[in-house]
A protein has these predicted regions:
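A detector for short, charged/polar N-terminal pre-domain segments
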Residues: 1-5, 69-72
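Short basic helix-loop element that most often maps to the first helix and adjoining turn
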Residues: 5-24, 49
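Conserved hydrophobic/aromatic packing and binding residues within compact polymer-binding modules
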Residues: 7, 21-22, 32-35, 61
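Short, charged recognition helix plus adjacent turn
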Residues: 13, 62-72
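DNA major-groove recognition helix of helix-turn-helix/homeodomain DNA-binding modules
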Residues: 26, 45-60
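Recognition helix of helix-turn-helix/homeodomain-like DNA-binding domains
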Residues: 26-41
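DNA major-groove recognition helix of helix-turn-helix
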Residues: 36, 54, 65
Length: 72
C-alpha cells in the first residue's frame, strides 16, 4: 500500500515522531504505528485531518496523484 509510505514520509519530512501525530489524531502512539504499518486501516476522519495538517490533498496521501496541491 503506497499510502503507508506517504504517511511516514510526510511525518518524517516535518521531523515529527509517531507520538506527535497520535496526539494530533487523539489516539495513542501504538495505534498510530498500526496505521503506518498497515496493521489497521486509517479511518477517513484521520485521513482528512492529516491532509489538512500536512497541507496536501487526500489524493496525494492515497497515492492517486503526485500533486500535493492543497485545497481547503
Amino acid at each position: 500500500m503506497y499510502y503507508l509510505q506517504r504517511l511516514r514520509d510526510l511525518r518524517e519530512d516535518m521531523d515529527l515522531e509517531q507520538k506527535d501525530i497520535a496526539k494530533l489524531l487523539g489516539t495513542t502512539q501504538p495505534q498510530y504505528s498500526r496505521y503506518e504499518t498497515g496493521e489497521r486501516e486509517l479511518p477517513i476522519r484521520h485521513l482528512v485531518t492529516l491532509a489538512d495538517f500536512y497541507k496536501v490533498s487526500t489524493d496525494y496521501i492515497l497515492g492517486r496523484t503526485n500533486n500535493k496541491n492543497y485545497k481547503p
